[in-house]
């Protein structure tokens, strides 16, 4: 499944080369051919995050203060960790936490 992942608000600094936009190809982990957000977050942790994963994740989810959008819609409205992703979806992660 081809997805576009975008990172902003400083989250891109946790990734290799600090790249904001990533075009990725994920294979479903289960037998029904679906990719859900929980699986995507585990994949991001294993494949994209190169330092301080605790700044992005808390347990199996994103940490408080990280806004997640699936095709410009708040992921909580789409099902949160159980939200099913579809081919060519765009998932955006934005940190709303910053110093002052």
From Swiss-Prot:
Similarity comment text for this entry: Belongs to the URM1 family.
The keyword tRNA processing is annotated on this UniProt entry: yes
Main location: cytoplasm
Gene3D superfamilies for this protein: 3.10.20.30
Function: Acts as a sulfur carrier required for 2-thiolation of mcm(5)S(2)U at tRNA wobble positions of cytosolic tRNA(Lys), tRNA(Glu) and tRNA(Gln). Serves as sulfur donor in tRNA 2-thiolation reaction by being thiocarboxylated (-COSH) at its C-terminus by MOCS3. The sulfur is then transferred to tRNA to form 2-thiolation of mcm(5)S(2)U. Also acts as a ubiquitin-like protein (UBL) that is covalently conjugated via an isopeptide bond to lysine residues of target proteins.
PTM entry text: C-terminal thiocarboxylation occurs in 2 steps, it is first acyl-adenylated (-COAMP) via the hesA/moeB/thiF part of the MOCS3 homolog, then thiocarboxylated (-COSH) via the rhodanese domain of the MOCS3 homolog.
Cross-link (Glycyl lysine isopeptide (Gly-Lys) (interchain with K-? in acceptor proteins)) at residue(s): 100
Biochemical pathway: tRNA modification; 5-methoxycarbonylmethyl-2-thiouridine-tRNA biosynthesis
One GO cellular component term: nucleus
GO MF: protein tag activity
HAMAP family from the UniProt entry: Urm1
Entry-linked Pfam families: Urm1
Residues that bear 1-thioglycine: 100
Keywords from the named record: Cytoplasm, Isopeptide bond, tRNA processing, Ubl conjugation pathway
Record GO biological process: protein urmylation; tRNA thio-modification; tRNA wobble uridine modification
Location(s) in or outside the cell: Cytoplasm
CDD domains: Ubl_Urm1
Protein name, per record: Ubiquitin-related modifier 1 homolog
């Amino acid at each position: 499944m081809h997805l576009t992942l975008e990172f902003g608000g400083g989250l891109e600094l946790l990734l290799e080369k600090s790249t904001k936009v990533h075009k990725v190809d994920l294979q479903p982990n289960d037998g029904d051919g679906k990719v859900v957000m929980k699986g995507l977050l585990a994949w991001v942790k294993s494949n994209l995050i190169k330092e301080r994963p605790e700044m992005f994740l808390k347990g199996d989810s994103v940490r408080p203060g990280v806004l997640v959008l699936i095709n410009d819609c708040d992921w909580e409205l789409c099902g949160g960790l159980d939200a099913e992703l579809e081919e060519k979806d765009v998932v955006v992660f934005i940190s709303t936490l910053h110093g002052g």
